[in-house]
Amino acid sequence: MPSATSHSGSGSKSSGPPPPSGSSGSEAAAGAAAPASQHPATGTGAVQTEAMKQILGVIDKKLRNLEKKKGKLDDYQERMNKGERLNQDQLDAVSKYQEVTNNLEFAKELQRSFMALSQDIQKTIKKTARREQLMREEAEQKRLKTVLELQYVLDKLGDDDVRTDLKQGLSGVPILSEEELSLLDEFYKLVDPERDMSLRLNEQYEHASIHLWDLLEGKEKPVCGTTYKALKEIVERVFQSNYFDSTHNHQNGLCEEEEAASAPIVEDQVAEAEPEPTEEYTEQSEVESTEYVNRQFMAETQFSSGEKEQVDEWAVETVEVVNSLQQQPQAASPSVPEPHSLTPVAQSDPLVRRQRVQDLMAQMQGPYNFIQDSMLDFENQTLDPAIVSAQPMNPTQNMDMPQLVCPQVHSESRLAQSNQVPVQPEATQVPLVSSTSEGYTASQPLYQPSHAAEQRPQKEPIDQIQATISLNTEQTTASSSLPAASQPQVFQAGASKPLHSSGINVNAAPFQSMQTVFNMNAPVPPVNEPETLKQQSQYQASYNQSFSSQPHQVEQTELQQDQLQTVVGTYHGSQDQPHQVPGNHQQPPQQSTGFPRSSQPYYNSRGVSRGGSRGARGLMNGYRGPANGFRGGYDGYRSSFSNTPNSGYTQSQFNAPRDYSGYQRDGYQQNFKRGSGQSGPRGAPRGRGGPPRPNRGMPQMNTQQVN
């Protein structure tokens, strides 16, 4: 007995939790059945849903009663196990414990079965409702199609030809009689009435919709002396005759035949009109290609592809560029409106000269960008009035200098426009002030522009050769000749535009592609002509950047004071000593004797400190002048450039003994360290008068006397 009771007790405990789930499941099924009953289903579906809800409710109640009864029996069983005495009724109830448990299990199984059945019924009802909905939609669409067809037929009955065809018939059998046509006409007035402004539009067409609905339903209501059913039969007979279908296809066939007949004519017209647009397109492509190539190296305001009569104005010297990329010859030459009075030396084919000049400009867009930190300090400072000018020239001839434009390198051009540089009748041998770093490593060919041998025409164009003299590393392996007409750009003065406080305009065209790392204002010793000629042949093994392409030499002239202002640097030489500077800016000293210093101080172009006297500016130069321990010429600061991997120069070592004392960086000399005046190692700061700045990232140069 105890074992049985314990087993039954355990069974009751194990079977206790499912009844609530079962009851909740029945409630869920009933809740699921409730929405299904709300669907617009048929009467059978609604009855089934309602019956299933009632069955599930009865089973749920029976399960709850059995659970309560089983709970009481479990309580009696526990009391009996504790030794309490029970009355006879309680003992009878405990004896029926197994029967109650079996009934509870049966009720749960029955509930699960009815729940599954209810779910199947719900799915069936939903499918039926969906099918009925689709059927209703199809019926409605069919009725709507019938209404549209009826309106079309009633509209076509107003045509006399259609009425005649319907009365005669296609095969001799009449489709409609005159009486039937009149009935349809009366019905047409009902379904498509004239607008009555006394009624609202909704009310007026509501009556028309009722007539159409009754016609579609085929009701026996009287209308127009007949019934809707009779009218529906008449309309269906017209639909079945396929009269409007055949007529519609026949009309389409005529349209297609007409279109097919007109198609060849259109094709012939298009074929005749095709050659002209093709020619126009070809001409446009040529003009566009010419504009694209020419706009790379000149300003848009100076471009004009239409003026081909100025081809004869391309009288410039022949430019030979080794290792150059060949470009296609240009079809049209741009117009050059500005006059330039230069002296032509050699005459050749204008097309060949223009091609070579453009090849030179295409390769002179160098990638170097060794800009000094001192050049980036004061970008918006105006030109210091203390910047000294070079020796003047005799203003007998004026050479107009146009604005140097290089749109591929810098977005702005800060050069002054149309500065006039007076030139003496005799050609002068002046240093070429450019930003090319190979200017300090090249050999001795001179830059000798000639201005008095012949008189160039007034409209000699040099705008196409106004590019920056910044050479690419690919060009440094061979010598190249630069035309003399392209060199006056180095005399461009920048006094009218804001410059750096250091006096160097890094935004100028020579400084846009690569920034100079040398100071152009080193003192040049007064040497005689034989020494210069001797020194010119001394470094022939080095890299030669030749700027002398003239077939004959011209005489040299002297620079006069207060006329020529340069941006990179100003040179003050002695009035009584003509100084000859090679085109590569190098003047090596004598190998046997010391370097004689000139009595004339040399200034750089950087600003002087405020408050100083005008005559004492030479003393503030930290690395120029006779008082700062400067010994030797340019060769004292020339690096060997012994096949540096980043420079691209392939120079051989020079014959003269030179000391470079740890001052080489990729083959480029960085900058002169700011020196001092006569009073100490560092003098007054230049520029805006601020404290001296450290030489950021630049190795210090130790100046040594060259023997």
Curated annotation (Swiss-Prot):
Induction: Down-regulated by exposure to trichloroethylene (TCE) and dichloroethylene (DCE) in fetal heart. The modification Asymmetric dimethylarginine is found at R696. Pfam families: Caprin-1_C, Caprin-1_dimer. GO terms for molecular function: ATP binding; molecular condensate scaffold activity; molecular function activator activity; mRNA binding; RNA binding; signaling adaptor activity. GO terms for cellular component: cell leading edge; cytoplasm; cytoplasmic stress granule; cytosol; dendrite; glutamatergic synapse; intracellular membraneless organelle; lamellipodium. mRNA-binding protein that acts as a regulator of mRNAs transport, translation and/or stability, and which is involved in neurogenesis, synaptic plasticity in neurons and cell proliferation and migration in multiple cell types. Plays an essential role in cytoplasmic stress granule formation. Acts as an mRNA regulator by mediating formation of some phase-separated membraneless compartment: undergoes liquid-liquid phase separation upon binding to target mRNAs, leading to assemble mRNAs into cytoplasmic ribonucleoprotein granules that concentrate mRNAs with associated regulatory factors. Expressed in hippocampal and neocortical pyramidal neurons, but not in Purkinje cells. Residues 358-379 are annotated as: G3BP1-binding. Tyrosine phosphorylation by EPHA4 promotes interaction with FMR1 and liquid-liquid phase separation (LLPS) for the formation of a membraneless compartment that concentrates mRNAs with associated regulatory factors. O-glycosylated (O-GlcNAcylated), in a cell cycle-dependent manner. O-glycosylation by OGT inhibit ability to undergo liquid-liquid phase separation (LLPS). It is found in: Cytoplasm, Cytoplasmic ribonucleoprotein granule; Cytoplasm, Cytosol; Cell projection, Dendrite; Cell projection, Lamellipodium. InterPro entries: Caprin (IPR028816), Caprin-1_C (IPR022070), Caprin-1_dimer (IPR041637). Its main location: cytoplasm. Residues 1-48, 325-347, 412-443, 523-558, 570-620, 641-707 are annotated as: Disordered. It comes from Rattus norvegicus (Rat). This is Caprin-1. Residues 1-15, 22-43, 326-335, 535-558, 674-684, 695-707 have a biased composition (Low complexity). Residues 431-443, 572-603, 641-655 have a biased composition (Polar residues). The modification Phosphoserine is found at S10, S113, S333, S341. The modification Omega-N-methylarginine is found at R163, R624, R631, R638, R696. Ability to mediate liquid-liquid phase separation is regulated by ATP: moderate concentrations of ATP enhance phase separation, whereas high concentrations of ATP lead to inhibition of phase separation. Keywords: Acetylation, ATP-binding, Cell projection, Coiled coil, Cytoplasm, Differentiation, Glycoprotein, Methylation, Nucleotide-binding, Phosphoprotein, Protein synthesis inhibitor, RNA-binding.
